[in-house]
Amino acid sequence: MVLRKVVAILLAILPIFLFAVEPIKVVRSEKEIVVLTRFEEYHFDLEKGILKDFYTLVDGRKHVFTYGNDGFDVLDEGTPLTVIEEPIVTGVGKVSEGFSDEVSIVYNYGYVKKIFTIKNNENYTFFVDIESSKPVDVTVPRVSVDTSTDRYLENYFASFNPKTRTLVLLKHDEGLLFEGTLKVNGQKRFIVFMGPNKRTLIKKAFPEDYDVLIKALVNIPGFNKWYDSVFYGLVWFFWWLKDLTKNFGWAIMLFTLIVRLILYPLYHAQTKSLINMRKLQPQIEAIKKKYKDPTKQQEALLKLYREAGVNPASGCLMLLIQLPIFMLLWSVIRYYVEEFAYSGSFLIWKDLSAGGFSNNWLFLVITIVASYYTTLLTSQDARTAWQGIIMSVIFPFLFVGLPSGLFLYYATNTLIQLAVTYYTYKRYKIKGLTTRELLGLPKKA
């Protein structure tokens, strides 16, 4: 009864610590305008009206682009134009801290007007509108100095950096591309994707041309990794689950459950091996006491394992097989961090991309409690149980700063682990410890 009241109170106060999608912030200084979204940081020069630097803000601050005469400079017969007045910053969805929907920066060069528009979404996409009363050239950005990773496609320009695994995709709609510049006469809009090499985001940015783009991009050295066929198979399966459930939170839980069901035979084999070893433990201890010589002791143990049909290494082998699989699954969930932030709430969590104790404490409690009971089920003595419990308390705190979507995966996996362990040990009639036994208390009369 008390536990129910505590949980009810915690659930009531949790939304206080949660927040919705952050607005776009604009910071102006003497030399530049900085635009900050949840995952992007743009630096625009005031005098030239060009993009100076671009950073992504997932997993720290990563420098993706720096200006090298390729930041959407406007050239008239090869001469760069400079703005003739202070740029104008406008936006949609004005709030106290910035703009909720989009921000536009307007540069006036006299006979040329240029507008950068940045929307508040997960796609790393922005727009550049050019309006000119005479023919001019506009430079296109590159994320790598190595031009061998450039690709010139119909209506598109691509630049890829294998070291940072970032790219630029610029849609120019029949603009003539020559030596890194585009010909503009009249009005022209460029759609620009600048960010990490994530195919789901590329598909959202350019859905109508996605297949053509990927076909060209995979031929760039370093664009693909050797495990991409498996990895992206899981990525698109998760995408399908999200479309099915209409929510990333439910998709994470369903994804975790399905994968654990598929991997159950491996886990069952591992657990069965551990149970068999537990049954042999009295005989193993007797052999260790009887034979002090390491060689004779090893021979006796091998004979015991052979007669019992037990392979002591099989449990570890099954665990080693599962580890890379779970690391791959973790990477799949992590892949969607940007989309967690812009895909609505899940139960009481408004933003599955947010991390920290205030967002993850409930997952922390669930994980620790589930791990506690799993440890009791699998332990033979209080000393071993305490070691496992201490680890199960410390280990989740290492994840507390991660996005809630990742912690949801971890917590769901821990709950499924508890359920599977309980079922397996019940099936084989293996008794674990009770809380009273753990604390060294006598059994109830």
UniProtKB/Swiss-Prot annotation:
GO biological process terms on file: protein insertion into membrane; protein transport
Coiled-coil region: none
Chief location: membrane
MF terms in GO: membrane insertase activity
Pfam families named among the record's database cross-references: 60KD_IMP
Keyword Protein transport in annotation: yes
A single GO cellular-component term on record: plasma membrane
Topology term for the membrane: Multi-pass membrane protein
Transmembrane segments: 6-26, 248-268, 313-333, 352-372, 388-408
InterPro entries in the cross-refs: Membr_insert_YidC, YidC/ALB3/OXA1/COX18, YidC/Oxa/ALB_C, YidC_ALB_C
Cell compartment(s), UniProt: Cell inner membrane
Domain of life per record: Bacteria
UniProt keywords, alphabetically: Cell inner membrane, Cell membrane, Chaperone, Membrane, Protein transport, Transmembrane, Transmembrane helix, Transport
NCBIfam families named in the record: yidC_oxa1_cterm
Subunit structure: Interacts with the Sec translocase complex via SecD. Specifically interacts with transmembrane segments of nascent integral membrane proteins during membrane integration.
Described function: Required for the insertion and/or proper folding and/or complex formation of integral membrane proteins into the membrane. Involved in integration of membrane proteins that insert both dependently and independently of the Sec translocase complex, as well as at least some lipoproteins. Aids folding of multispanning membrane proteins.
Sequence similarity: Belongs to the OXA1/ALB3/YidC family. Type 1 subfamily.
HAMAP family with a match to the protein in the record: YidC_type1
UniProt name for this protein: Membrane protein insertase YidC
Organism: Thermotoga maritima (strain ATCC 43589 / DSM 3109 / JCM 10099 / NBRC 100826 / MSB8)
